[in-house]
Amino acid sequence: MHYARIASKLREKIIKFSGELSAGMPKVVCRFIAESLYGIQVRQSVRLTEIARSLEEKIPLRKTHSRLSRQLGRAGLWRKITHSLFRMSCSHIKEDTLLIMDLSDIAKRYARKMEYMARVWDGSEGEVANGYWTCNVVAAEVGEMVLTPLYSRLFSQNAPDFRSENQEIFRAISMVSKQTDKKGSWVLDRGGDSREIMDHFLDEELEFILRSKGKRHVIYRGRKDSVYNFALGCTLPYMERVVREEGKQEKIYFLEFGVRPVKLPGREDRLYLVVVRGFGQEPMMLLTNKPVKRSRKSIWKIIDSYITRWRIEETLRFIKQSYNLEDIRLLTYRRLQNMMALVLAVAYFAMVYLGLKTKLRVLARHVLTAAKRLFGIPDFRFYALADGIQSLLFRHQKGFDSFKNMINTQTSQLKLFDP
C-alpha cells in the first residue's frame, strides 16, 4: 500500500475517532478536538503553536492559536473527554483486568508564570523542581501486551480545589469504578498501603493488590506487628524465575515466595500478605484482599499481577516522550488539565484504537514500517507507532484540505445533536 494512501486512511481514522470522542458536544468543540488530535500527532507536541502550525490555515498563525486557546479553556472539557473515553474503553475491562494506578510528575524547571505551579519530585532528575502531579490509570491483562489508558488528571497542591493526594486517588478510583461496575483489581505501588486508601478499597468492596513499605501494622494469628516483621518470618516454599528488561539488557531474577493470611486492626476483612525474596536485599511485600490459596499457582498470580504494573512506567514514558509532554506551555490550570485529557485520547488512539479491528491492525503494521529507526522497532512498539503516525501525516499533507473538509462535514452532521 502506498504511504500517501495510508496517510489518507489515518486521517479518516482520526476523524472517526474524534467523532466518537466528541459525540453530543457542540460543533465548535467537535472541530477543536479533531484538530487537536491531528495536531498533537503530526507535530508530536502539546504546544498550541505547533498544533496551530499543523493546521496550515490561511490566516495569521496567532489567530489560529487564539482560537485553539479559547476552546482549550472551556469549562468541563476534561470531564467530557474522560467520560467519552470511558464509554469507548470500559468494554475492555473484565473481572481480572488490572487497573494500575501511578502518580507521576511533569517538571517545569524554568517556568515562572504557570498557574498554581508547585514543587514536585522530578523522578528523571532525582530532585525537587517546579511542576505538576498527574494521577494516571492504565488497564492491563496479565501476560498480554495490550494496555488501555483510562484516566489522566493533572493536579497541584497549590490549586484552590486541592484537598489531599489521597482525595485525588479516590477521585480516580471512584470515576473508573463507576464506569466499570467495580470490575478489575486495583494495583498500587509503595504508599498505596496507607490505612485511608486500604479502608476506602474495603468499604467500596473493590479488589486490590498493594505494595507495602512494611511499616503498616497487621494482625496474624491474634498477634499485632508490622508487615515487615511478619514478612521476615514467612516461609517461602515456592520458587520461580523471571526475566526483566533493564535498559537494553535482560536481568534474570530467581524468586522465592509464600503467603500469610492477615487482618487490619479493627477490621474483620481477610487480607493476604504475599512475600517475595529475590528482587533485592529486602523482601517485596504485597497486601491483597483477593482470595489466595497456599499453592504456587494462586500465589504467583498475585505476584505476576504486580509485576505487570512495571509496564505502566513504560507507558507513561511513551506519553511523555512521544508527545513532549514536559514542553507544555499553558498558563492557566484549566487549560493544562484539558490538555492532559487530549493527550490521553491521543495515547488511546495510538495504543488501542488502531488495534481494535483487523483492518486497523494491518494499518498499524504499515505505520510501524514508516518509522525509520536506527536499531529497528523496539519491543515497546508504541514509540515506533507514534513516530510512524507523525512521519506519515507530516510528509503527506497533500490531502490536508480534504481532512479539513471531513472535519467540517462531521461537525455539520453533529449539529443536530448539539445541546
Where are the predicted features?
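Single, function-defining residue in the core of a domain
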Residues: M1-S45, S54, S84, T97, ...
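Active-site-proximal, Lys/Arg-enriched surface segment
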Residues: L37, H65-V142, E256-P261
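Short, basic interhelical loop/turn and adjoining N-cap
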Residues: S54-R67
